[in-house]
Amino acid sequence: MSETTNDNYGASSIKVLKGLDAVRKRPGMYIGDTDDGTGLHHMVFEVVDNAIDEALAGHCSDIIVTIHDDNSVSVQDDGGGIPVDIHPEEGVSAAEVIMTVLHAGGKFDDNSYKVSGGLHGVGVSVVNALSDKLQLTIRRQGHVHEQFYHLGEPQSPLTVIGETEATGTTVRFWPSSDIFAITTFDYKILAKRLRELSFLNSGVSIRLIDKRDGSEDHFHYEGGIQAFVEYLNKNKNPIHPKPFYFTAEKDGIGVEVALQWNDGVNENVYCFTNNIPQRDGGTHLAGFRGALTRSLNSYMENEGMLKKEKVATSGDDAREGLVAIISVKVPDPKFSSQTKDKLVSSEVKSAVESAMNEKMQEYLLENPADAKIIVNQIIMAARAREAARKAREMTRRKGALDIAGLPGKLADCQEKDPALSELYLVEGDSAGGSAKVGRDRKTQAILPLKGKILNVEKARFDKMLSSQEVGTLITALGCGIGRDEYNPDKLRYHHIIIMTDADVDGSHIRTLLLTFFYRQMPELIERGYVYIAQPPLYKVKKGKQERYIKDADEMEQYELTLALDGAELHISTNAPAMNALVFEKLVAEYNSVQKLIGRLNRHYPAPVLQGLIYQSPISIEMMKEESAVENWGKSFVEQLTAKETEAHQYSVRTQFNAERQVYEAVITVRKHGIDTDYFLNFDFVHGNEYAKIVSLNKQLNGLLEEGAYVIRGEKVQPVRSFEQAVEWLVKESRKGLEVQRYKGLGEMNADQLWETTMDPNSRRMLKVSIKDAVAADQLFTTLMGDEVEPRREFIELNALRANLDV
């Protein structure tokens, strides 16, 4: 645990290690890979680590991470706020020193922070150096201070912009597209790490908000890694009530372990060093496994169980159904690479091994009832392993395969290089037939799967092996299965493509196959070998013309193109037609804003958002005058009331934002006698979404005059608004349009299947990846496990998001 030893954390506590140019020259050394997204997300974690350090020192309890609509990220904490006084050596504010000098911060001054969670990091200055723009907001000593930076250079001194009683720091940054190949943040990657941090730092509240699509999570767990294990076992059946937990220190190394067995067959062990996850384990995992096997074996030996049961157990049996977290605190850890995926510090193995051995033996002796349950499960696992071995031998002896050693249903390809070979797993024999005819025989193999394959989430290993469809699949893949025989390097195809129908059964079969790969061959997903084919959703016919359409977005685009084909907009009775390109661009922008309104609908009612398109814009400058905001609000409410068709009543008032020194409009909507307030606050008016609405507003305002009309073909339609013009054109274009929704692959002939789904030059595929292993594990357990209640909750929670095709 961190402790603060000096309350005077100010400018003089900040220790400086200089040199920021090196960061821009070799960003990969400081932040990780700038091409594959790891460095980009590390930027967020670097800022979050600073807030976590504040929390560990007892200064902060709430951290809010927001992905904004413009792909910037802000990290806000309610800590003490970065010091704003002038630094004695540097002559500028301490905040500016922290933001512009490499490795500057209170973590290097032993009196301010005794233990630092973010010490492995490189400081927020690196984030600043690699951002096109960074906005720093500090709430401290009654004032709000703000400063902007560009690629690490301050654009102005730290300035007081408002007053506040709150304290804390907000860092918002826009990563530089010149440095990062990808600048789009992935919600799942951030959620995975923030969830880990909230468990590893018990009691810290971390909120993650995605303004792009409204996703939101709140990670707040008391109970540390013990709670983490309980969370991982949620929706599973733990076989003993309370997780085994201990914390110890050996030779200056802190060891913390929590574990609990469930009645499943999968092992889930997560390792951390100084809060950093090791995907590939390392010396702490080796020490843990060695001690676990040894202490359990010695217990079973002493109790005479192995003799009585006549069974030989292995370490793998002991880890069946095991969920464990190993967290070590090491003063100077050594990793196998820059990514810190594997710990190689040799002293950690003996520290973990001796602590684990001692505590596990104590636990087994002090909890005989739990020990008996655990040991019985291990003995059952050993028996199942033996049964599976016999089943495999039996299969070999029976010669269930054809002469080539491959299943008869498999139509193999000629190519022998796995990197160039593709295996299509096709639902049903009819689609399998079309695929076999339509494929490229050189590189594409087809394996039709009949009916639904076994749900491996619920089945024991020996039952799984006796399933015909699973057996066929394992043989075709060629990489074996089970701990003794599985070798992903022997895989015969590096593109395994799941191709199922676009109906409920197809989705179920796809989920069953994904469950199989995730539980039995996770390396194939990790190596990027598993794909999902994306056959077209629609076939549209207009007259004699036919075309395939991939998804709803493309359908919308197609309808728009059709609507504008030969269409003309005349803005008044005698005006010539608007330029076709200008009209098309305006319609595209209008549609983009309509989608934006759909997204914002969770926060503001649609009539208010639609009204903003036609209301003269409000600016930050206007918001400095209360009377200007009042007048704007009155005019807006009049416009809303005039358009009102439902029983809604609107009113407006203003509120003062002391932090920003501006007046904000508050729109009150009364519906069925209930008042709801909607705040058009500084952040909204200053944000990207409102900027897009204003841009459209400027183009539409006063565009149509008296007598405006739209023409399409022979038809003429008078219109009063641009919205009316677009709606009429789309409605007209749909006349005579036949839309066929594809549900089965068998509905396409071989040529159509090749052209739309299998031709490498034109097909679209989704690559299956696991960005958040914990969330993936939870989802597979919820959807495919034994427990019905969590599945019902999941359906109730997500029912409204389902896209029904009735």
Swiss-Prot record:
Mg(2+) 1 binds at residues 427, 501. One of its GO terms (biological process) is DNA-templated DNA replication. It holds the Pfam family GyrB_hook. One of its GO terms (molecular function) is DNA topoisomerase type II (double strand cut, ATP-hydrolyzing) activity. Its EC number is 5.6.2.2. A type II topoisomerase that negatively supercoils closed circular double-stranded (ds) DNA in an ATP-dependent manner to modulate DNA topology and maintain chromosomes in an underwound state. Negative supercoiling favors strand separation, and DNA replication, transcription, recombination and repair, all of which involve strand separation. Also able to catalyze the interconversion of other topological isomers of dsDNA rings, including catenanes and knotted rings. Type II topoisomerases break and join 2 DNA strands simultaneously in an ATP-dependent manner. Few gyrases are as efficient as E.coli at forming negative supercoils. Not all organisms have 2 type II topoisomerases; in organisms with a single type II topoisomerase this enzyme also has to decatenate newly replicated chromosomes. This is DNA gyrase subunit B. It comes from Haemophilus influenzae (strain ATCC 51907 / DSM 11121 / KW20 / Rd). The lineage of its organism: Bacteria, Pseudomonadati, Pseudomonadota, Gammaproteobacteria, Pasteurellales.
